[in-house]
């Protein structure tokens, strides 16, 4: 869905970008439809994907077990940061040097985690959970809820790029609740082994905590203990709310 003021060239550019990414990743686009919709200020894209895998290759988040380590692969908030740059590039250009924003744009191709998932499938990972809308805090909750387990994690071990922190500070956003597609939580009894294997491939990975019996979901930060809350709305929603208020 596109705003009524969007040009046809915008739709064509979106389809070219989708086609290029699919070609690079060995995917096919079977069908695409588009329409102009009143009342929206930005393009909305819905994707339905279909794939096949052997049963033993499926590593659903509900397969996580208590007593295993939680490994965070890649950086939290990266996708959200790139989307903020696209939405608020002009505002950010007033605060940051061009080299800063160009460096972030160069990271766009690095958010994909397909290689990391291949490695995980061969290294004893019992469960995986992608970090999407709502950020890592939502992903941790959803993973624990789906598996019926608890967890204990440390915020200081969660990998986040300094650029993401600085962009979030401009708009007073929480990077831990920012959409993070491309980052993945992996649960394994051999966390250190998996981390080192991924790092040898140049893939950022850190052990951020472990799963536990029961339902307590604990986050440690600054020496303080707190309990993980139910997922809050993604911080990107605040960006769109700000844009709507400006345009109102």
What are these regions (language model features)?
Residues 187-193:
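Helix N-cap motif at beta-to-alpha junctions
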Residues 22, 37-42, 61-65, 118-122, ...:
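Solvent-exposed alpha-helices and their adjacent loops that cap or buttress functional pockets
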Residues 3-6, 105-179:
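Active-site-proximal betaalpha loop/short-helix elements
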Residues 82-101:
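Short, compositionally biased
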Residues 201-248:
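Acidic, Ser/Thr/Pro-rich beta/coil linker or hinge segments at domain junctions
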Residues 28-33, 49, 72-73, 127-131, ...:
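General beta-strand structural signal in soluble alpha/beta enzymes
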Residues 1-85, 210:
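Glycine-rich anion-binding loops of enzyme active sites
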Residues 46-60, 95-119:
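Active-site glycine-rich loop that binds ribose-phosphate moieties when present
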